[in-house]
A protein has these predicted regions:
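Short, structured beta-strand segments at or near domain termini in extracellular proteins/domains
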Residues: 243-256
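Functional-site microenvironments in short loops/helix caps that host divalent-cation chemistry
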Residues: 32-33, 39-47, 84-231
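Sec-dependent N-terminal signal peptides
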Residues: 6-14
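Boundary at the C-terminal end of the N-terminal hydrophobic targeting segment
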Residues: 19-22
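A short glycine-rich, aromatic-capped structural motif
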Residues: 24-85, 105, 184
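Positively charged n-region of N-terminal signal peptides that target proteins for export
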Residues: 1-4
Length: 433
């Protein structure tokens, strides 16, 4: 047997195919992922409720996945300007470290650039393709069992300040499909819009037709190890980018599966304009009215620690309150809930979930109703992970008294101190909030 034949036989035996893409430039190596099926999700207690229900998924066609996350050198063959971000906050300065500070649109653009260059179809993996490739035939918490090997751990805890770690790819053993760093190193963007799972067998699912957040998977450095599980779901505003997230790619046609229709549900809210009565200047005193009223039925858990409220009025005469609900003020489970005191009512509605970037701390909310337009503004912090120190700032608006809300926009994109808002938003004479 000559050397070439022996090399080819070894590749087939290992179930992977090493090839080159994006020449000239750093080689991207791919592994062959066979068609098959698996059980997606987990039992999902508590904060992991979005991993339920467990459901059977068929991946009907084989595909090829990059054996590592895309590196700085590989990404910068497409976007040389990214080199200025190497070493930001102390992370990822080397050619062979995973690229970070890349948003979903940039990751998607890299795939389209490479596709055009090579005459093949490269794209981000769907969430189902990602979990199937990560599990590689396993059914435990991780592809290696219920614990990760020590070599795969990179500062698996959270801190209020940045603690740099080496993000060089492929420094620990691959999974059974030959893929490195599927648990940790950096989070990885997926193709899908984030949304709840549903029951029933599925074939080649592609997620939702629209949404607020794009799925990320795999967890990262500087993250508690439970967020690195095969089933763990995370997501981000697609324009967000930070030191925890990068991506890997697959070579495969875009799935023909139809996406799940996006939810168009709106809260039933009166849309009349209230007539406000002048009550003169006499002070009035009322006993407090409880506004944190847990719902009897909810698709998301409400936690015991409810704090940091903000309240505003609505043009229809309602009062609207928001606050965070969490187990720990440093926790990634933190979510923004809200309630309404309807015009003329003497008790608040049951609370309901308003805003949740999956697996991100969301400390700090502020509300304001513009007296001229009736538009309601919500400003809220969003962390890269846990804690509440390095927040970016997102904004949403409502033009129908809080019945529906706009897509979140990042208005202060840097995850840095100084972006924790609290109640008391004002408008300056120049119109600034």
């Amino acid at each position: 047997m000559n050397r070439k034949t022996l090399f080819t036989a070894l590749l087939l035996l290992l179930g992977r195919n090493v090839c080159s893409a994006g020449e000239p430039g750093p080689t991207i190596r791919f592994a062959e992922i066979p068609a098959g099926w698996f059980y997606m999700g987990s039992g999902g207690p508590g904060a992991d409720y979005d991993e339920t229900p467990i459901h059977k998924v068929v991946i009907s066609r084989p595909f090829r996945m990059s054996v590592t996350e895309i590196t700085n050198a590989q990404y910068e063959a497409f976007d040389p300007s990214h080199r200025a971000l190497r070493g930001k906050q102390g992370f990822s300065s080397g050619d062979n470290e995973a690229v970070i500070f890349v948003d979903w649109h940039q990751a998607d653009a890299f795939c389209r650039w490479l596709s055009e260059k090579e005459g093949r179809t490269y794209r981000l993996p769907t969430e189902a393709e990602w979990e199937y490739a990560c599990r590689a035939g396993s059914c435990m918490h991780y592809s290696f069992g219920d614990r990760l090997p020590k070599a795969a751990l990179k500062n698996q805890e959270e801190h209020h300040s940045f603690i740099p770690v080496d993000l060089t790819v492929a420094q620990s053993a691959p999974n059974a499909f030959g893929l490195y760093d599927m648990h940790g190193n950096v989070e990885e963007w997926c193709y899908d819009w984030y949304g709840p799972y549903f029951r029933g067998d599925q074939t080649d699912p592609v997620g939702y037709a629209d949404g607020f957040y794009k799925v990320t998977r795999g967890g990262s450095h500087s993250t508690p190890v439970e967020y690195l599980r095969s089933a763990n779901r995370m997501a981000m505003i697609p324009e967000d980018k930070h030191f925890l997230t990068g991506f890997r790619i697959i070579e495969a046609p875009y799935p023909a599966t139809k996406p799940v229709p996006a939810s168009t549900a709106a809260e039933p809210v009166a849309q009349h304009v209230a007539h406000w009565v002048d009550m003169n200047d006499q002070p009035r005193y009322y006993t407090p009215i409880e506004y944190v009223i847990p719902p009897q039925i909810s698709t998301a858990p409400m936690y015991p620690h409810n704090h940091c409220p903000a309240v505003t009025w609505c043009r229809n005469g309602d009062l609207l309150a928001v606050w965070f609900s969490t187990i720990s003020e440093f926790g990634r489970e933190m979510a923004i809930w809200h309630s309404r005191l309807r015009c003329g009512a003497d008790s608040w509605d049951e609370a309901s979930l308003l805003c949740k970037v999956p697996d991100r701390n969301m400390t700090g909310s502020s509300l304001r109703c513009d007296p001229d337009s009736g538009r309601i503004y919500l400003l809220n912090g969003v962390e890269a992970g846990g804690w509440w120190r390095n927040l970016a700032l997102l904004a949403q608006t409502s033009d129908d008294n809080g019945a529906t809300w706009s897509r979140p926009q990042i208005v202060s994109p840097e995850h840095t101190p100084g972006h924790q808002v609290i109640a008391g938003m004002i408008r300056s004479s120049e119109g600034w909030l």
